[in-house]
Structures are given as structure tokens and as C-alpha cells.
Design a protein with these regions (language model features):
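Blade-level signature of beta-propeller repeat domains, shared across WD40, Kelch, NHL, RCC1
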Residues: 522-551
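Intrinsically disordered, low-complexity acidic/Ser/Thr/Pro-rich linker and tail segments
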Residues: 2-31, 48, 55, 59-191, ...
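Short glycine/acidic-enriched loop and turn motifs that connect beta-strands
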Residues: 314-317, 407, 454-456, 539-541
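Loop/turn-rich, solvent-exposed surfaces of beta-rich toroidal or solenoidal domains
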Residues: 396-410, 437-462, 466-467
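Fungal eukaryote-biased detector of long internal structured cores
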Residues: 67, 96-107, 111-339
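Short loop/turn segments that connect beta-strands within the blades of beta-propeller domains
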Residues: 56, 157, 166, 208, ...
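Signature of short aromatic-glycine-proline-rich micro-motifs recurring in repeat-based ectodomains
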Residues: 198, 380, 387-390, 515-524
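Structural signal for beta-propeller blades
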Residues: 170, 221, 266, 409, ...
């Protein structure tokens, strides 16, 4: 007869078994899987988990950094939400098969990333967009010589910053490192050897090169070509403008050039491609009511050229308003039509009568109801009232953006079709804590605004404001992002010249007696997908080119 096992013996055995199991540790069920299976599993993880996986081992670091994983994350975070937003604005629906597609050429406004032979670092691209969405960047500065008169002109195009002033001529700088001067050409190569001041600058991006046009105070303008591959800046030709006074504004869309002189003469020119100096004036018009600030725009199609001039004027009812004149030319320079509109109706909250002839619209003092059922009286008081002229304006079709001294911006949507030209709605944009000195907007609705003190730069996505146009629904500060350089306080000290980059050929000393506090002025040189460049006058005789890098 067998003896019964004691209960104490059984408990001891179970305890030893648990200890053995605990010494083995958790079972690793992932390392034995193939890379294909692991990539499929990682594709379901959020960004925070992918970042953790990169710190586990070399294998997981390589797998979690796979470009296709980040490409899908990029699409989910940035591409698809924008497509949904635009579909709701246009009152359309997305196709049923609008899920992720590996073909970047099918993504909205991402064709530049699908160029032949171009390999995109999707993790870096995701980081770039993430930094833009949070305003995170690094700030670097380049100090320029004492401010000449007129001040330095600057433009950003295809990763190159072009500056123009009377002392140093036309210079090209690398946007990645603005302290590096790529090329330089003095203005004395023109027919007049005397020093003249540049008053306007325009740049157009060509295949493998950039075309630069500089306008001067004597009404002349010079043409230059910058070869991207060799970084050679070459003077091409000098021409006399249509006006007798200084060139005040220019817009270029090669091979066409639009310019305005100080005597309010608007002229359109055709620039012959190649190394020849032939420039033909296509049209010239005299303007009587153009008041600064103003902006020019030039668009081309297969059949016509559309030149647009936006200017400010005072309206007795709603204060300072904007006038928009659109001129249509054929390729030979024949004027096809001229159309004029303003922002007055939008400032009153009136929707345009698009179904009536333009002559009938001017005779009507009432406005048809949006549903077409009845007529509504024109409001007595405007919803948008500006007592002071705009401090700056920017127009990139269809977006028109102005800045004001009352800490606000105003956005308009310009609609131009074969039958009509009108402004759809107007929306005040809030978020700045001081007067806004300058704005720039792209045709995709991305905008940069700079406060008058220079320490507040905000990023706007104006596509999000389209649904609120013409309504009382505000577009608040939460809809914009303030740029916050990570290294501004720790690396940069405006009072310490030793902490600023300075080009070698621009070494100079500033008299300490002149260093006193003055209101800073700034000019937004431009921005692209990776950076914002700002030209700022900090103190007397001190000009800084600031580069805000989001990479």
C-alpha cells in the first residue's frame, strides 16, 4: 500500500517550479519572426511606439526606421486629412478607394516628391512636417553691413537667397547656410558705371537655373542667370523700363515680366530665352489710383497671360479696402479683357451676384439670397472695418492676405473664371500680440506672418479657414502656430556679436555709441518646405538674415 504524499511536499514542488519559470523570463515571440512579418506588425503601431522600437536593438532600429513605414504614417497624418478637408469644402465625396496608395504621384500636391530618380527620406519628411505643425526649428543668423539706403532687397528661390544692394551688387547665398556666399556680381557691368540703388527684385525658377531681374531707381532693370549646378551668377543684359522713375514692384513668370514704376506706369515685357538680350514690351498702361502697399501677380497658361495688380484705397463706408485689377493678354501682347473688383462687398458680408450681368450688378442695391429665393438688404455697417491702411499684402492666386496694425490679418479668396472676377468672403485672423508688419502666402494656402517687434512669427494653413469665410465663425489663434526656435535663448544673444555668423567679405565694426534700442523692422525674405528666412534690422547699423530651419 503506497503512502500518501504530504501536502508540504506538493507545495515545495510547486514553489520550485514557479521559481524555475520565473528565472526563464518572458517568452520572446518576435525575434523568431521574419522581417516581413515584423514590418507588417510595426505598420499598425503609432509613432510613439515606433520610436521606442528603434531603441530596442539594431534589428528593430533598422526595421522601425523603414522608409515605407514612415511613408504610410506620413500619408495617414498629413495627406488624407487634407484631402478630406478639401472634399468637405468643395462639397464632394472622396472615392471609395481613397485609402493609402504607394504612388506618391496620386497624392494631392506631392508631385515634386515623385520626380524621376528622386529617393525620399520619409522619416525625415515626416519629421519636417511634424516640426512645422509645432513651430519647432533651429535659428541661425548672418550679420550684414550697416543698412544702406534703400535697404537690402532679398528673395528666396529654390534654396538660394538672392540679395541686392548698391555697395555689393547682386549676391547669392545658400539657404541651408546663409553665411556661405555662392556667387556675386556688381551692378557696374551695366551701361552706366555710376552707383545706382536697386529698388525691386524678382526671381523665377527655371530648369537647372534661376532668372533674376533687378530694377533700379533710374527706371532701368538688369537680367541675370544663376546656374544651379555650377553656382555661377552671370549678367545677361540691361534694359530701360517704360517709366522714367524708379521701378517699385516686379513679378516674373518666365519668359514674361510685369513691373510698376514710381510714376504708376504698368508694363508687361517678353524676355527672349537664351543668351540674347532681346526684351519686347507687350503692353503699357497708366494707373492713377494705385496706393502703396501693393502687390503684383503674373500667371500664364497655354493661351493667355493674366497680370494682376492688388492695391489699397480708402472707402468711405468700410475704411481701407483692396482693389483687384486683372488684365488678360494674348501671347502676342494683345489685351483681351480687363476686369476690376474690390473687397468692399466682402467687408460688408455680401455675396456676389454671380448669375447677373456685371452691368446689372452695379444697378442693384440689394443682394439675392444665397438660396435664390429672395433679396436681402445691404448691411448698414461693415463686418470688416479698417481705419488704417494695411501694413503689407501678399497675393498668390487664389489667396489674398493682408496684415494690419491692430494685430490682425485679413484673408480673402479671389475667384477668377472665364466669365467673372469676384472676391469670396473675408475673414479676420487673430493670434498676434502686436502689430503685424509683413505677410507672405503661397497658392496652397500656407502663410507666414511676422510681428512688428520681430519676436513673433506665426504659421497659417488658410485652407482650414475657407469654410468660415463670410460667416461669423472665428478663425482663432489655435488655428495658427507660433514659431519657437529651440536654440534661440541658449545659443543666440543679440547683444553678443561673437555669437553671430558673419560673412568673411563683410567684416566691419559698429561704433558702440550708435548701439541703442530702436524699433526693429523686418522683411520676410521667403519660405519653402524646409525653412523661413527673415531679414531684420535689430539696432542702428545692424542687419541680420535669420534662417529658421525646420529639418
Amino acid at each position: 500500500m503506497s503512502k500518501r504524499r504530504r501536502e508540504s511536499d506538493e507545495s515545495d514542488a510547486s514553489t520550485r517550479k514557479r521559481r524555475q519559470d520565473s528565472s526563464v523570463g518572458p517568452v520572446d515571440r518576435l525575434s523568431s519572426l521574419s522581417n516581413e512579418l515584423l514590418l507588417h506588425i510595426l505598420s499598425f503601431l503609432p509613432i510613439s511606439s515606433l520610436s521606442v522600437c528603434q531603441r530596442l536593438s539594431r534589428r528593430f532600429s533598422a526595421l522601425s526606421g523603414d522608409s515605407e513605414l514612415w511613408k504610410r504614417q506620413y500619408y495617414t497624418q498629413w495627406v488624407r486629412p487634407r484631402a478630406r478637408r478639401l472634399a468637405s469644402v468643395r462639397r464632394s465625396s472622396l472615392p471609395n478607394k481613397s485609402e493609402y496608395s504607394p504612388k506618391v504621384s496620386t497624392w494631392l500636391d506631392h508631385g515634386h516628391l515623385a520626380a524621376d530618380g528622386k529617393v525620399t527620406n520619409w522619416k525625415g519628411q515626416y519629421r519636417l512636417r511634424h516640426n512645422w505643425s509645432r513651430g519647432s526649428c533651429r535659428l541661425s543668423e548672418v550679420e550684414f553691413p550697416p543698412r544702406p539706403y534703400p535697404p537690402v532687397l532679398a528673395k528666396l528661390c529654390a534654396g538660394i537667397v538672392f540679395t541686392a544692394d548698391a555697395d555689393h551688387g547682386l549676391q547669392a547665398w545658400a539657404a541651408k547656410d546663409p553665411a556661405i556666399c555662392l556667387a556675386k556680381v556688381l551692378f557696374s557691368k551695366g551701361p552706366e558705371s555710376s552707383k545706382i540703388c536697386p529698388t525691386a527684385l524678382a526671381v523665377s525658377d527655371l530648369k537647372g537655373s534661376q532668372e533674376i531681374v533687378v530694377g533700379f531707381e533710374n527706371g532701368h532693370y538688369n537680367r541675370y542667370i544663376m546656374e544651379t549646378e555650377t553656382s555661377q551668377l552671370e549678367f545677361r543684359s540691361c534694359h530701360k523700363g517704360s517709366g522714367e522713375e524708379a521701378v517699385t514692384a516686379m513679378a516674373i513668370s518666365s519668359p514674361y515680366l510685369l513691373m510698376v514704376s514710381h510714376d504708376k506706369l504698368l508694363s508687361l515685357h517678353h524676355i527672349h530665352p537664351g543668351k540674347t538680350s532681346e526684351v519686347r514690351e507687350l503692353a503699357s498702361l497708366k494707373a492713377d489710383n494705385v496706393i502703396a502697399p501693393m502687390t503684383l501677380s503674373l500667371r500664364t497658361s497655354n493661351s493667355e497671360i493674366v497680370a494682376t495688380i492688388v492695391y489699397s484705397f480708402f472707402h468711405i463706408g468700410c475704411g481701407w479696402s483692396l482693389g483687384i485689377q486683372e488684365l488678360h493678354f494674348s501671347k502676342t501682347g494683345q489685351q483681351l479683357q480687363s476686369r476690376l473688383t474690390s473687397t468692399v462687398d466682402s467687408q460688408y458680408g455680401i455675396r456676389p451676384l454671380r448669375n447677373l450681368p456685371s452691368s446689372t450688378k452695379r444697378r442693384h442695391s440689394t443682394m439675392a439670397d444665397p438660396r435664390g429665393q429672395s433679396e436681402t438688404e445691404v448691411p448698414v455697417m461693415p463686418s470688416i472695418l479698417h481705419q488704417q491702411p494695411p501694413t503689407s499684402m501678399s497675393y498668390s492666386h487664389p489667396y489674398l492676405l493682408t496684415s494690419h496694425a491692430d494685430n490682425t490679418l485679413t484673408m480673402y479668396l479671389v475667384v477668377s473664371n472665364s466669365n467673372d472676377l469676384f472676391v469670396r468672403g473675408g475673414q479676420r485672423l487673430w493670434g498676434h500680440t502686436s502689430s503685424v508688419s509683413t505677410v507672405q502666402v503661397t497658392n496652397r494656402g500656407k502663410a507666414i506672418s511676422v510681428g512688428s517687434r520681430g519676436d513673433e512669427i506665426r504659421i497659417w494653413e488658410l485652407e482650414m479657414a475657407i469654410p468660415s469665410l463670410g460667416t461669423s465663425r472665428p478663425f482663432n489663434e489655435e488655428s495658427s502656430i507660433q514659431v519657437n526656435p529651440e536654440n534661440k535663448e541658449e545659443d543666440l544673444d543679440f547683444d553678443s556679436p561673437s555669437k553671430r555668423s558673419r560673412p568673411e567679405d563683410r567684416d566691419f565694426e559698429i561704433d558702440s555709441d550708435l548701439e541703442q534700442d530702436f524699433p526693429s523692422s523686418q522683411q520676410c525674405v521667403g519660405f519653402d518646405d524646409e525653412r523661413v528666412l527673415l531679414l531684420r534690422e535689430k539696432t542702428v547699423g545692424t542687419q541680420l538674415l535669420e534662417c529658421y530651419d525646420f529639418t
